[in-house]
């Protein structure tokens, strides 16, 4: 609901599905970058930031993924897989004892998602 409210008040085009898709993939990428700093013994803020990015990606994904699926089902599957991996990496507000996802795997999935949308989203939208 907060995301929808912000989109309604945001700049023209903020609610465009391509822009929402780009924002979703950006949040997945940021969650991936936080993961290497988000384990036990690391600052808790890194984990919370990653969790926030993963949840923002989850909440913003439906409109962008539906839009992408109509154009390129394989690219949509790639983004959905990266999102699922991000949500697995950040299962809740407590840092897991053992990481569910290795940082290099998450970074690779995020990179694949960025590449998958690159021909559907303009550079300014990424």
Predicted regions, residues:
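Mature extracytoplasmic or organellar-lumen-exposed domains after removal of signal/transit peptides
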Residues: 1-126
